Design a protein with these regions (language model features):
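Edge beta-strand at a domain terminus
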Residues: 1-29, 62, 125, 140-177
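Hydrophobic residues embedded in beta-strands of well-ordered beta-sheets
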Residues: 136-138
Length: 177
């Protein structure tokens, strides 16, 4: 007797406590944001990347075979998942006693500490890292455990001169003489 079985299932993601339940995030870090790249577990292939400014921070854990000698994280397209496979970003698994585990985006309070009311645990999506003339560019298209979209941008190659808006200002100031 031979049976031909087909199973269909719907993946149900478990919400992570303290994860933001609504309100999508689209944020561009300034070119002068602080960037920290470390070989988190030397020899294991885990590279930590933190990008932070006065208001927000993002913390990624890349599974990579080696650090890039110029920008730290090797250029590439990295899916966010929990596989620990080379070429991936480790998905957030939840909150530990000292803060969120693995990859997350969050707001910062006035003292620079993580704001638990602005926490996005990155559980699925893609992180693209590029080397643009020796400068790091990062694009993130992800979701948290509530499927709230998180889109992030960082481009160290941009300069203030290149980013000047070209549209006319709605209000003009004049000086009387």
């Amino acid at each position: 007797v031979q049976y031909d079985l087909t199973f269909k299932t719907k993946f149900v993601r478990e919400p992570i406590p303290f994860d933001t339940e609504e309100g999508e995030m689209d944020y561009t870090f300034p070119t002068d944001a602080e960037v920290i790249v470390t070989d988190f577990i030397e020899g294991y292939g885990m590279i930590q990347l933190i990008i932070a400014d006065e208001s927000y921070a993002v913390d990624f854990y890349f599974n990579a075979d080696a650090m890039d000698p110029v920008i730290g994280v090797p250029a590439g397209v990295y899916p966010i998942d929990g596989s620990f496979e080379s070429g991936t970003v480790l998905a957030c698994k939840g909150i530990l006693p000292d803060g969120p585990a693995q990859s997350y985006f969050c707001g910062l309070d006035a003292e620079g500490y993580l704001d638990p009311l602005q926490l996005y645990c990155l559980v699925d999506g893609t992180v693209i890292v590029e080397n643009v003339n020796g400068k790091m560019k990062v694009e993130v298209d992800a979701v948290n455990s509530y499927d709230v979209p998180v889109v992030l941008h960082y481009n160290a190659a941009d300069s203030a001169v290149e980013n000047i808006p070209t549209e006319k200002v709605g209000t003009q100031k004049r000086i009387r003489t």
